[in-house]
Amino acid sequence: MISKQGWINLYKPKNITSFKAINSIKKNFQITKIGHAGTLDPMAEGVLPIAIGKATKLIPYISIMKKEYEFTITWGSQTTTDDSQGKILFESNYFPTKNEIEKKIINYLGYINQIPPKVSAVKINGKRAYKLFRENETYTIEPKKVFIENLSITKHSTDKTSFKIICGKGFYVRSFARDFAIDLKTYGHISSLK
């Protein structure tokens, strides 16, 4: 039996939304008051902190804590979703070297301005960006100030680089991949996120 108060650290698998993961718990355990601290992209896997009952009051405090991700950028193409689930928008046959990537990392530490992905949960005039995208609406997402505490390469091959990052609230790894690739004079998208 599950308590009707407290926290569940749910390991969300790939290819389901955070919303679907929460609804499954809500339905299967007849929980009325439930919420989550942050959202994981559908293609991402990892821990999704879920608050139940009175614990939902703590969500704003948990949400501001630092997050750690491991992710891989595939170089050479930018997609509509900034991950491997989207359609290819742009392509390049230029792949950055490990040395070029390492030199750019320093520019991204600390506070940076970041434009969230076109397909995201960001609200624009009360409507989620992903809904506007599906309806083929034209819209602009304003940049947000985000924080990167640490960023390091964990693995590199010709067309892919894996990283580990510690970042603050509101950071989009997909946006980072898109912008970082453009800064390296190529295109890129997230092919794995954990």
Regions found by a protein language model. Give the residues of each.
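Catalytic/RNA-binding core of pseudouridine synthases
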Residues: 1-194
